[in-house]
A protein has these predicted regions:
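Bacterial N-terminal signal peptides that target proteins for export
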Residues: 2-10
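A short, hydrophobic C-terminal helix/tail in secreted or cell-surface proteins
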Residues: 315-319
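Aromatic-lined carbohydrate-binding surfaces of glycoside hydrolases
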Residues: 52-54, 66-78, 82, 91-92, ...
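Bacterial N-terminal signal peptides
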Residues: 12-19
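Contiguous, structured surface segment used for ligand recognition
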Residues: 25-122
């Protein structure tokens, strides 16, 4: 058996270290080196990325140069991505947008004219609402979502709404509460109308949703939220506010489930009273199923009365 000497092993080890990309030691800068390579393939090696402290608690970025490299600094991955976008716009006169990119870059990137330092307005830069996804992104694949996530980071977004894969969360939750596969799938609206289901206006429109679609959305959602976290974003997940299938009343006849009024020609949704013990049980399972698929990241959205109204008993209405 051929043996490698200790000196040769040391040489191979050191040589391997020098072959590692510059971003290998830091996950935050690594994420943005990879973003740069996705947006401008072949150019990431011309940048040096550095993490700096925030500016009095505010996100900050810098664009600089040293005669050889473009130096981007920021206190978060999103701040670094924002610096990259600023450099493209104002040094390279390049452009990245929803409607097309202008990325006619020279082989050797130009140095910034001077050091630029900017703070980012707003601690929480929220992006998207439920309608956005169904209006625009209902049929996006991972390739499209990658571009959108890079665009978010380059435009300082750090708190995007996360809804892709919610149909899988609901499907799994309902199986815990005596719904069959078909009943659970029949509750779910099609992708083009899912927004209004998550806003608790309707159910079932465009259903029953095929299990293959539910599984595909779950797989896509896992990729999306992993990338959001990699880019240092804080995803907004779905909370449980008591919106439930109308059919839940048939399965739990003693539960306090109220029927909402009709909405835009659709039969009204059902609302589980938060004081009912079933609310706590169902909410816990919903959040557990969501965490099992996508993790639990601390910020949740829930609106039980979107374009609807509180339900009152006749006694309360008289007060």
């Amino acid at each position: 058996m051929n043996l490698i000497s200790k000196n040769k092993i040391t040489f191979i080890f050191l040589f391997s270290i020098f072959l590692l990309p510059a971003y290998g030691a830091n996950k935050d800068t690594k994420a943005i080196y990879e973003l740069i390579e996705r947006v401008t393939p072949g150019y990431s090696s011309q940048y040096r990325l550095e993490i700096i402290a925030p500016d009095n608690g505010v996100d900050v970025y810098e664009v600089d140069g040293n005669g050889k490299e473009i130096i981007l600094r920021g206190n978060t991955p999103v701040a670094l991505a924002t610096a990259f976008n600023w450099y493209l716009k104002y040094t390279c006169q390049a452009h990245v947008s929803w409607f097309g990119n202008q990325l006619n870059l020279p082989e050797k990137l130009p140095q910034p004219r001077e050091r630029e330092r900017r703070v980012i307005n707003g601690r929480y830069r929220v992006y998207m609402n439920y309608c956005t996804v169904s209006y625009t992104a209902a049929w996006w694949d991972w390739e499209h979502w990658q571009k959108e996530l890079d665009f978010m980071a380059m435009n300082s977004v750090n708190m995007p709404l996360f809804t892709i894969g919610l149909d899988a969360v609901w499907y799994n939750t309902l199986l815990h509460f005596n719904f069959s596969d078909r009943e659970a799938r029949a509750f779910l609206a099609g992708p083009g109308h899912a927004a209004w289901q998550w806003m608790q206006n309707l159910q079932s429109y465009g259903g029953p949703l095929p299990k293959s679609v539910i599984d595909r959305h779950a797989a896509l959602g896992k990729k999306i939220i992993a990338r959001q976290l990699e880019l240092g974003m804080q995803p907004i997940q779905q909370g449980f506010s008591g919106y439930v299938p109308r059919e839940l009343k048939d399965k739990y006849p003693t539960a306090n489930i109220n029927q909402q009024r009709s909405w835009c020609g659709f039969k009204g949704a059902a609302q589980l009273d938060p004081t009912d013990s079933l609310f706590t049980r169902m909410g816990r399972v919903f959040l557990e199923e969501q965490a099992r698929l996508f993790g639990a990241h601390g910020v949740y959205a829930a609106d039980p009365f979107h374009e609807s109204c509180l339900l009152y008993t006749s006694d309360a209405a008289d007060d």
